Amino acid sequence: ERQTRATEWYYQIEKGFSQTNGGQAKSDPQSLEGVRGDLYDHSVPGGGDGMAYAYGQCTWGVAARMNQLGLKLKGRNGEKISIINTMGNGQDWVATASSLGGETGSTPRAGAIVSFVGGTHGTTASYGHVAFVEKVYDDGSFLVSETNYGGNPNYTFRKISQADSAISFAYTTK
C-alpha cells in the first residue's frame, strides 16, 4: 500500500494540485529532493486549504497542509480545535491558536505550526511567517514545509537549526 500511495503522490507532484481558485499547489522538486524521507506522515505537501486564504501565501500553505493531513489544533485540555480563516498574519498564528484554547510552546514537535516574528529568520517585518514542522531531529533542529518563503508560492523546505525567542509553536492532533 505504501508503494501505491508513493506512486500516486509522485504523479500528483509532477502534475500539480488543482485549486478551486485556479492556483496550483506543488512541492518545489529541487527543494523536495533532499527531504523526501523526513516528511510528516510520509506525505508530500499539496492540495487545497479549504479556508479561502490567499493562494501561495504562507498562511495558505499551512492551512492546506493541515487540511491535507486532517489535523486540528490540540487544545490545552486535549480537545480538537479547528483553525479558522482569520488566524492573522504568519507571525500571529500561534497567538491566535492560544486564544482559541490551543496548546502552544517553545519546543518544536512534528506536525506543529511554527510562527516567526516579523523581521526574523528572513521574514518580512510587517507580517512575519508561518510554516509547518515536518520533522524534529535529535540535535533539536527541525524541518519545515512552507509557501511564500522568499516569494516562492510552491512548497519549499528548510531546516531550522534551533528554536529561539522569535519562534513559537502551536501543537496539532489528528
What are these regions (language model features)?
Residues 17-130, 135-137, 145-146:
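Secreted/periplasmic proteins that engage bacterial cell-wall peptidoglycan
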Residues 11-12, 41, 54, 138, ...:
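Compositionally biased, intrinsically disordered low-complexity regions enriched in proline and serine
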Residues 127-174:
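Aromatic- and glycine-rich peptidoglycan recognition patches
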